[in-house]
Amino acid sequence: MASLKDLRDRIASVKATQKITKAMQMVAAAKLHRAQEAVEAGRSYTQRMDALVTNISKDVDLVDAPLLMRGTGNDHVHLLVVCTAERGLCGAFNTQIARLAREHIQKLHAAGKTVKILTVGKKGADILLRDFKSLMIDHVDLRSVKKIGFAEAAKISKQLIDLFNEGAFDVCTLFYSRFVSVITQRPMALSLIPAGQNPVDEGQDFVDQAKSREVSQSAVYEYEPDVASLLNDLIPRHISVQIFQALLENVAGEMGAKMSAMDNASRNAGEMINKLTVTYNRQRQAQITTELIEIIAGAEAL
């Protein structure tokens, strides 16, 4: 049985931990509000960009389409871009994304495909390194970036396009977590290259793309100088926008998951403090009772 001193020390330790988890919860809540605003603002732009590319691509012959759109004609080498958080303490957020990527890798291997992995975020890299170290070709470290901006997405996009032009892969798929609510984040797999493809997994990429495409379906476009030249400029930006939106979704999802995790941790700490306090009071009461009995017994002996 723990001594009273041990119980006091343990109660103090749990209270200190609870203060930390509550502070982290408040910080995550503040960051979540800003991240959620960025996600909602970005979704509209991403929707329209996707609809624009989809509709313009209908007016160009496949042979005249940019290589990023028509692809290599093969699907043997797959590059998986797995985006996770740089830090932990956010529940199963990182694990869920890595699990979806792992399932996709297993399916590709079963189909005889070659798989390469590029990770964005330390936690996802740590998880996948355990089983797929030989498949890793690069890692993007964003720990020094205080606020995710379009510049970070553009750098990743340029790296992917350069690799594609060098013939490093045929198909590129982006893994991230779509922000649904504070307690719900949905792992997604989105086809990046060839551009204009459908999502790899069930559901829609970002927000109901079918609806956004339908809205712009009846639009009539005139192109200057020509549709192929326009797509050559538009497709790289489209890829950058998709990556940027995925990063924004990840930030919001991470903050939501962290807020929930820290709230649960604070509640658990509170329950533990109550239990330890009850145990401490009982032991203290028993000790006082024993001391009184000893004093009374000594007085009677006199």
Curated annotation (Swiss-Prot):
Subcellular location: Cell inner membrane
Keyword Transport set for record: yes
Gene Ontology biological process: proton motive force-driven plasma membrane ATP synthesis
Membrane topology: Peripheral membrane protein
A single MF term (Gene Ontology): ATP binding
Keywords on record: ATP synthesis, Cell inner membrane, Cell membrane, CF(1), Hydrogen ion transport, Ion transport, Membrane, Transport
Pfam families (UniProt xref): ATP-synt
Transmembrane parts of this sequence: none
Purpose: Produces ATP from ADP in the presence of a proton gradient across the membrane. The gamma chain is believed to be important in regulating ATPase activity and the flow of protons through the CF(0) complex.
Quaternary structure, from the entry: F-type ATPases have 2 components, CF(1) - the catalytic core - and CF(0) - the membrane proton channel. CF(1) has five subunits: alpha(3), beta(3), gamma(1), delta(1), epsilon(1). CF(0) has three main subunits: a, b and c.
Family as reported in the entry's similarity comment: Belongs to the ATPase gamma chain family.
Protein name: ATP synthase gamma chain
Species of provenance: Bartonella bacilliformis (strain ATCC 35685 / KC583 / Herrer 020/F12,63)
Gene designation: atpG
